Regions:
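N-terminal and secondary-structure boundary signal
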Residues: 1-137
Length: 137
């Protein structure tokens, strides 16, 4: 496995959406992901309200989608999850993700709704140090 890459770029309010494409290029997105597979966009909703330092912002989401599409990633889906501190529907609405996803035809799925996806049991093939002791089933 290749080492992780971190890309940092100076931006401005006028260029921030476009700058995401350059960030994705610098980080090696095209080499790390397979255009023939469905690409899951996992937004971060730490709280229902907009907290730019804690949540995905609409401009991050739009810049990422634009970059993915420009690089040939056309099978995109945004997946929301449920936590003890978030209500995904409210976070999606309050953080203004819906208009961005609709603009680019990216469907929303919820990993806790049976109609959206099912969970498959994963059995690690390697010996685990402690994970199997913490999560026994």
């Amino acid at each position: 496995m290749d080492k992780s890459k971190v890309a940092v770029l100076r931006t401005t309010p006028q260029t921030v959406v476009e700058d995401y494409h350059r960030l994705c290029q610098l980080a090696g997105m095209r080499q790390a992901l397979d255009t023939s597979k469905t690409t899951i966009i996992k937004d971060n909703i730490s709280w229902h309200l907009l907290y730019p330092g804690a949540n995905t912002t609409p401009w991050q989401l739009e810049g990422t989608i634009q970059s993915l599409k420009a690089e040939g990633f056309n099978d995109l889906v945004c997946v929301h999850n449920k936590t003890v501190v978030t209500i995904a529907d409210l976070g999606d609405r309050y953080n203004k993700f819906g208009p961005v996803l609709n603009k680019y035809g990216v469907p929303k799925k919820y990993n806790y709704k049976p109609e959206d996806m099912t969970w498959v049991r994963y059995q690690p093939k390697a010996k685990m140090l402690v994970l199997d002791k913490i999560f026994r089933d």
